[in-house]
């Protein structure tokens, strides 16, 4: 096997080797290819990047060329438009008016065009020479094919070594020299920018006659045409030029330099156009844009990057010179070699050198102005006279016509002409002067402190003014216009580059006028009349001192005036705001007249001869003569100032008469107040506002009109504190006395009593609480009505006005009721007798506490005034409709009439005759009345909360009542108890009739609902105001938590079933109850009993109630102690900790809320140890059948009557149990229920507060209303015999122990 493998290896070894070599070669080749691909990729990407860069450069170059071409075409278009017009100005020397920059193409071309147009009558030089701009100027001429030798220093305008062309060379000689060539080819010579390439023609100035103008250089292109095409036209045109008068003069054409060799002569053809109008709207617009841009650059400078780039091409920028007097501005170009002066107008050398020597110069770059000191910037430099360059004498006529003449030397027509031509030469129409003035009038050279000579106002400002204003003095100046100014001042005046001083002043004044006109909308506020001149003389002081004293002369009729000068344009912002405020006041004075002090000052300044008419908006207003300040008297009507000696008049509007009446009334009222009287206007206002018999005499019987407060104080001692007689006293005492009298006067004549103030404060608090609680408007009126006492007949007779007592008052709610019943329906009202008893009891209780007192009629507050009849009726109707809507919605109105009939007649008469027993019953009024039977809990989803207003009032009455032992009278307690029982009966009836439930008013309300089967009460309120009083005997139900008797629990209803179903259910429940435990829940009678309580079936007479008393003073205490059954007390041992907590006033521990009792989760204290509470299968919500409710209630009240008559002499402490209950007890015993162990034990009196105490029922339970209360009013349940909220209790019907005890106590 090994030999075979070796053989195979020997034979196949070359194959393996070759294969390995091949793979290695492939790998190397792949790596090499990848490496080369990467390198190629990098090279490719670099190439793409370079291509993009090159493309961008090409695009930028083409874009720059296109932009340059467009920029070059704009001047060409401008010049073509200018040449197409026929404008022939009357003045020359316009170069300095357009631009100071010698390299500006537009201004140079425009200057030459204007000059040639001025000379067109003599020479007819063609403006076609100005066809193209300098940078793109093309020279088209027939030349030979030989090349030119360009000079690198060609077209150097700033060189002084330029040769001068002989002065005797004429146009014909040049033409003959150029037309010698016969064969020539058209060649295009392009003049490029000398700053970029440096290959230009070298041009030099030529000496000319006095009437000719010197060109700054050959900036215009010369068009040289082919001879074959233009020979005839050229000869004809040259002949015309020779015949013209201007052929003797020399043209501004400069020949080529000797370095330019021309082998073939060329023919020059100069073509001219007919003169046409020059300024068209488009030309004006372009010139305005150009000048505006140029002046903006001169003021603010070019952008930083543009300036830096220009500095590279212009290493020696021009330096500006300020003007002197009214001469135009020129400039100096400072070079490194020497200085040369170029002037574009003819000026004599003497004048020029005298002007240039010692003058400060200014740099060209605006950015350098703020870099150094002003002295360094404006450095003076001597300039040598250029001998090699002759300067011609100036044309004084042109200068005189162009520059504004001094004041007083020209008339109005010439001034108007100067204004027009100034705007024309500057390219600034009047519409554009505002924008330019805001740009360059505030240049660096112009300062607000600069003092300038006066000037004459132009014609367009002279319009008549509407009001006379004293003219403010302009800055003082030299008296003669020829007087020279100081050198620093001349340096400051020259800040405006191209306008003279007079032009600056004129334009600035125009801008001020336009600004004010636009701002105030007044077209002629500061205008001047054209026919007069101002006569203002000034006396000034030296420059370094304060401003000169001004002597003002005011103008007569028609004389001009003004309040503004050119200095106001340079004032700061705050001063400008003050000026605007002054103008506003001025406009107000125009309409309403001037103030008195201003009138007096004007009257002192104005003389009797300088008065003029004052139109006041076309309305004739009364004039008032100002003889004494503060006493204006009408003097008449008219529109002029009345010339009176020492007195002045001013236009006064019609409203001043009304203001005068108001001032007089105010003075009278102040005098009456100081005298201690009530002002007549106040009394009249009271008379007009108080209706009917509530007049001023009735309201204030003790305050006769016109009688001072001091006399009233003598008659009425109560007014001693209100009236303070004036006596000499100190300043502080006098101020205090006057302030006291003033305060009393400002108040109403009768102050409010303390009781009324307290009521108002209480009302305000209640309304605030109602607002915070989100109550509706229906309940916001309740607090004020509940706290205010009801007015009886005795109070009505003593009041000064009649108060109508309503027959049936509106339902009143206490603050707690208003808070608890937010969103609930209102309660029903009682009858008339009930309302009267409530009012009496409330008043008695309030008087017992000292809260009410009878106030004399004169001390009655104004707030107790009754409402008007309409207001009262509307309130009654609104409340009645709201109540009826709620009654209809909840179904109350049908059952209310059933209950009012027996309640209002029988129950009340019977309840009054019932004895109340011993005084211990009054103690139980604050305590909880016990229950004989316990109703079942209702369905929480169908519970409607209701609460009567009468019950709430009784609650507050009972809280305010003192203890029963402190009350000496028995009748008051009796009436209160009877009324309380009756109200409780009403409440129970309303609860049963509407399916509602009552909440306790004791503690703050809660919205927690009560569900059936809960082991504890979801809402256990207590009265927070009641506390445990030491030494006071407590009933069993009073656990230290407050008045449990005031607490309302849930009440149960019956289901809508007939009597047979109820009997079957009752029998079934009685059978099931014998098998259940002895503990019970809170809301149900027993856990195994149905929620249809059989006590609500009133077929049998009312039963007797097993009662016991807990008083420590009665003689029957021993009987009550012996009669206590011990088994229920023994059963109550299980919840003893809860009872001890309740007796100490501590809250009960609560368990989670349970929805159904069948869940088997009893609350704490319900089930004793070892017992369980099974669920009842019959537990369901119960309802009271509405069909038999009326008959059952009638039977119930009838049985109560019979029982009360038969038991009239029965002992109030005990009552026998009902027979039906006894029968039920016997049946339960016979069925085998466990008997209760009854070892009798005596209980000590202090055990009534312990957990083993037996509950007791007092004598008031004998009253019909209380029996009804005990039947239907839910009370705190008790475990065993102790009242514990939220714990189980023993039912006398289903608990065999109680039934057995009742049977043993009351044998049949």
Swiss-Prot record:
Residues 465-478 have a biased composition (Pro residues). InterPro entries: SPATA31 (IPR039509), SPATA31F3-like (IPR027970). Its main location: membrane. Keywords: Membrane, Transmembrane, Transmembrane helix. It is a single-pass membrane protein. The keyword Membrane applies. It holds the Pfam family FAM75. Residues 464-488, 627-648, 844-863, 902-927, 1005-1026, 1084-1190, 1204-1254 are annotated as: Disordered. GO terms for cellular component: membrane. It comes from the Eukaryota. It is found in: Membrane. The chain crosses the membrane at residues 7-27. This is Spermatogenesis-associated protein 31F1B.
């Amino acid at each position: 096997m090994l030999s075979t493998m070796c053989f195979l290896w020997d034979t196949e070894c070359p194959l393996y080797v070759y294969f390995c070599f091949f793979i290695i070669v492939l790998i190397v080749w792949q790596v090499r290819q990848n490496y080369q691909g990467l390198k190629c990729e990098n090279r490719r990407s670099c190439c793409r990047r370079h291509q993009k860069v090159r493309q961008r450069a090409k695009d930028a170059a083409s874009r720059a060329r296109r932009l340059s071409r467009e920029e070059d075409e704009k001047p060409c278009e401008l010049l073509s438009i200018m040449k197409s017009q026929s404008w022939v100005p009357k003045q020359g020397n316009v170069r300095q008016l357009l631009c100071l920059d010698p390299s500006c193409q537009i201004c140079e071309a425009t200057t030459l065009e204007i000059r040639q147009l001025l000379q067109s009558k003599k020479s007819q030089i063609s403006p076609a020479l100005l066809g193209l701009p300098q940078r793109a100027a093309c020279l088209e001429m027939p030349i030979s094919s030989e090349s030119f030798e360009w000079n690198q220093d060609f077209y150097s305008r700033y060189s002084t070594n330029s040769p001068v062309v002989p002065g005797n060379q004429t146009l014909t000689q040049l033409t003959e020299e150029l037309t010698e060539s016969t064969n020539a080819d058209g060649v295009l010579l392009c003049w490029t920018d000398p700053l970029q390439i440096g290959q230009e023609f070298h041009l030099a100035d030529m000496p000319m006659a006095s009437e000719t103008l010197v060109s700054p250089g050959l900036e215009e292109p010369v068009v040289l045409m082919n001879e074959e095409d233009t020979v005839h036209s050229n000869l004809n045109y040259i002949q015309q030029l020779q015949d013209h008068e201007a052929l003797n003069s020399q043209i501004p054409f400069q020949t080529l330099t000797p370095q330019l060799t021309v082998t073939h002569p060329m023919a020059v053809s100069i073509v001219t156009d007919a003169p046409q109008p020059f300024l068209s709207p488009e030309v004006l617009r372009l010139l305005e844009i150009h000048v505006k841009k140029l002046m903006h650059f001169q003021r603010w400078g070019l952008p930083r990057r543009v300036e830096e780039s220009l500095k590279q091409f212009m290493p020696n920028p021009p330096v500006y010179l300020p003007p002197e007097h009214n001469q135009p501005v020129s400039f100096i170009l400072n070079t490194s070699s020497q200085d040369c002066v170029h002037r574009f107008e003819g000026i004599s050398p003497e004048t020029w050198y005298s002007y240039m020597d010692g003058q400060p110069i200014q740099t060209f770059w605006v950015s350098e102005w703020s870099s150094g000191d002003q002295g360094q910037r404006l450095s003076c430099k001597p300039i040598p006279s250029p001998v090699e360059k002759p300067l011609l004498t100036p044309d004084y006529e042109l200068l005189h016509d162009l520059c504004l003449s001094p004041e007083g030397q020209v008339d109005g027509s010439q001034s108007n002409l100067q204004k027009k031509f100034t705007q024309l030469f500057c390219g600034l129409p009047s519409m554009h002067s505002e924008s330019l003035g805001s740009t360059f009038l505030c240049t660096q050279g112009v300062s607000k402190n600069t003092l300038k000579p006066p000037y004459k106002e132009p014609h367009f400002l002279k319009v008549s003014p509407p009001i006379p204003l004293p003219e403010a003095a302009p800055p003082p100046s030299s008296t003669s216009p020829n007087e020279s100014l100081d050198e620093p001042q001349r340096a400051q005046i020259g800040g405006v580059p191209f306008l003279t001083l007079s032009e600056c002043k004129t334009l600035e004044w125009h801008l001020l006028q336009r600004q004010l006109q636009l701002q105030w909308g007044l077209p002629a506020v500061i205008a001047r009349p054209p026919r007069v001149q101002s006569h203002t003389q000034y006396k000034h002081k030296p420059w370094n001192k304060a401003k000169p004293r001004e002597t003002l002369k005011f103008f007569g009729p028609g004389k001009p005036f003004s309040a503004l000068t050119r200095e106001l344009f340079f004032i700061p912002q705050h001063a400008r705001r003050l000026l605007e405020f002054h103008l506003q006041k001025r406009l107000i004075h125009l309409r309403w007249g001037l103030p008195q002090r201003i009138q007096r000052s004007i009257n002192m300044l104005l003389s009797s001869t300088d008065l003029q008419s004052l139109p006041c908006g076309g309305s004739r207003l009364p004039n008032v003569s100002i003889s004494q300040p503060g006493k204006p008297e009408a003097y008449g009507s008219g529109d002029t100032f009345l010339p009176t000696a020492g007195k002045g008049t001013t236009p006064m509007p019609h409203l001043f008469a009304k203001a005068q009446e108001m001032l007089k009334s105010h003075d009278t009222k102040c005098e009456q107040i100081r005298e201690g009287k009530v002002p007549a206007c106040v009394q009249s206002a009271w008379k007009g506002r108080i209706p009917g018999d509530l007049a001023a005499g009735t309201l204030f019987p003790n305050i006769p009109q016109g009688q001072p407060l001091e006399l009233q104080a003598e008659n009425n001692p109560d007014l001693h504190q209100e009236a303070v007689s004036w006596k000499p006293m100190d300043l502080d005492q006098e101020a205090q006395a006057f302030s006291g009298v003033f305060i009393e006067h400002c108040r109403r004549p009768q102050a409010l009593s303390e009781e009324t103030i307290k009521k108002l404060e209480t009302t305000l608090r209640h309304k605030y609480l109602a607002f915070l609680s989100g109550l509706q408007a229906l309940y916001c009126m309740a607090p004020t009505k509940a706290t205010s006492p009801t007015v009886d007949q005795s109070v009505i007779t003593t009041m000064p006005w009649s108060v109508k007592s309503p027959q049936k008052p509106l339902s009143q709610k206490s603050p707690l009721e208003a808070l608890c019943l937010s969103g609930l329906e209102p309660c029903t009202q009682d009858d008339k007798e009930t309302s009267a008893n409530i009012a009496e009891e409330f008043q008695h209780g309030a008087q017992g506490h000292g809260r009410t007192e009878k106030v004399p009629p004169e001390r009655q507050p104004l707030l107790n005034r009754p409402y008007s009849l309409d207001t009262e009726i509307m309130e009654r109707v609104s409340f009645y409709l709201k109540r009826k809507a709620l009654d209809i919605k909840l179904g109350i109105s049908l059952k209310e009439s059933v209950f009012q009939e027996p309640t209002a007649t029988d129950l009340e008469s019977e309840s009054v005759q019932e004895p109340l027993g011993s005084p211990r019953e009054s103690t139980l009024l604050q305590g909880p009345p016990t229950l004989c039977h316990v109703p079942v809990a209702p369905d929480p989803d169908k519970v409607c909360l209701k609460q009567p207003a009468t019950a709430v009032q009784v609650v507050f009455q009972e809280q305010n009542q003192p203890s029963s032992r402190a009350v000496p009278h028995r009748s008051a307690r009796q009436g209160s108890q009877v009324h309380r029982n009756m109200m409780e009966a009403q409440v129970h009836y309303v609860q049963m009739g509407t399916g509602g439930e009552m909440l306790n008013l004791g503690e703050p309300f809660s919205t927690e609902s009560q569900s059936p089967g809960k082991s504890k009460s979801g809402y256990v309120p207590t009265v927070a105001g009641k506390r445990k009083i030491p030494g006071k005997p407590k009933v069993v139900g009073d656990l230290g938590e407050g008045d449990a008797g005031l607490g309302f629990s849930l009440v149960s209803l019956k289901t809508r079933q007939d009597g047979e179903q109820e009997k079957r259910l009752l029998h079934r429940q009685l059978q099931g109850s014998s098998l259940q435990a002895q503990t019970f829940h809170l809301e149900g009678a027993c856990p195994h009993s149905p929620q249809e309580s059989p006590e609500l079936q009133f077929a049998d007479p009312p039963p007797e109630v097993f009662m016991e008393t807990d008083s420590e003073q009665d003689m029957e205490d021993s009987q009550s102690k012996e009669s206590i059954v011990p088994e229920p007390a023994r059963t109550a041992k299980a919840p003893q900790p809860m009872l001890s907590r309740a007796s100490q006033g501590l809250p009960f521990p609560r368990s989670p809320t349970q929805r159904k009792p069948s869940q088997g989760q009893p609350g704490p204290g319900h089930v004793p140890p070892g017992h369980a509470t099974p669920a009842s299968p019959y537990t369901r919500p119960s309802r009271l059948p509405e069909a038999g409710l009326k008959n059952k209630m009638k039977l119930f009240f009838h049985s109560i009557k019979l029982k009360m008559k038969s038991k009239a002499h029965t002992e109030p402490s005990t009552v026998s149990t009902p027979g039906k209950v006894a029968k039920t007890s016997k049946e339960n015993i016979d069925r085998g229920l466990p008997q209760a162990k009854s070892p009798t034990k005596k209980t000590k009196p202090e055990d009534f507060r312990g957990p083993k105490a037996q509950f007791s029922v007092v004598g008031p339970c004998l009253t019909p209303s209380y029996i009804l209360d005990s039947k239907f009013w839910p009370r705190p349940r008790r475990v065993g015999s102790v009242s514990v909220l939220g714990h189980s209790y023993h039912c006398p019907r289903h608990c065999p122990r109680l039934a057995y005890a009742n049977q043993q106590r009351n044998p049949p």
